């Protein structure tokens, strides 16, 4: 079986995604770091099970310029993992690391697994950080995504940020409409109303019979219990 993760604590007051109240325990962080390695080293981590195998892990058809091939594969991977394009210095560092791993292991796939593990262990992946630039479109994309989807921005949202469509009212409205139609909006609908209206407290309350003579729960369809 799979051992349970250490508890990921919610914010004690207000909504559970308030950044100034969230913490990541050293125990949970260590578990995430080990997980990034164990997934990539799993015997089930194969071409048939991994959607980006051909684009990222597969041996290149033309290995003449290995460094250029690694760079080409890392750019979109890092963009999704870090929720914005990597700075040149950061990208260069991962390219050098991957190149060294491929050479030392004599295996392109093995080297790319190691660099993927390193990326998934980075604070830039594990933590959300706000840019000091007020008009950073990628920071806005992350805020929208985590607010409405409870998850990282997808490729389409990052592309909208890249193209500057989040910087004007018409473009932002178009993006928001697309996000609201996406199935991932169900996460928001499940969590926000319950937290906003404090339904957990309502379900735990016991109505006073004298004040609430007509209160009852249909035992055959207890809707309040399935919230």
Model-assigned labels for residue ranges:
Residues 1-227:
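Low-complexity, glycine/serine/threonine/alanine-rich intrinsically disordered linker
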